[in-house]
Amino acid sequence: LTCVTSKSIFGITTENCPDGQNLCFKKWYYIVPRYSDITWGCAATCPKPTNVRETIRCCETDKCNE
């Protein structure tokens, strides 16, 4: 599985997930209007939001977390 790990004006960066990590995730942490801290990566299980400002989406295909 290949997941996106970062995005910039120059394109995306991906990584091949290690064995046992069969999900890609994208996590948004709301900071102020129109600005969120976004994290991408691989996971064995879908992470759970730690507070109400956090949204997490998980998926199972290559680069699906773009």
From Swiss-Prot:
Disulfide cysteine pairs (residue numbers): 3-24, 17-42, 46-58, 59-64
Tissue specificity note: Expressed by the venom gland.
Organism listed in the record: Dendroaspis angusticeps (Eastern green mamba)
Entry annotated with the keyword rRNA processing: no
Protein name: Muscarinic toxin 1
Keyword tags: Disulfide bond, G-protein coupled acetylcholine receptor impairing toxin, G-protein coupled receptor impairing toxin, Neurotoxin, Postsynaptic neurotoxin, Secreted, Toxin
PROSITE patterns found in the cross-reference section: SNAKE_TOXIN
The family this protein is said to belong to: Belongs to the three-finger toxin family. Short-chain subfamily. Aminergic toxin sub-subfamily.
GO cellular component, one term: extracellular region
Domain of life: Eukaryota
Entry function: Shows a non-competitive interaction with adrenergic and muscarinic receptors. Binds to alpha-2b (ADRA2B) (IC(50)=2.3 nM), alpha-1a (ADRA1A), alpha-1b (ADRA1B), and alpha-2c (ADRA2C) adrenergic receptors. Reversibly binds to M1 (CHRM1) muscarinic acetylcholine receptors, probably by interacting with the orthosteric site. Also reveals a slightly weaker effect at M3 (CHRM3) and M4 (CHRM4) receptors. The order of potency is ADRA2B>>CHRM1>ADRA1A>ADRA1B>ADRA2C/CHRM4.
Recorded GO MF terms: toxin activity
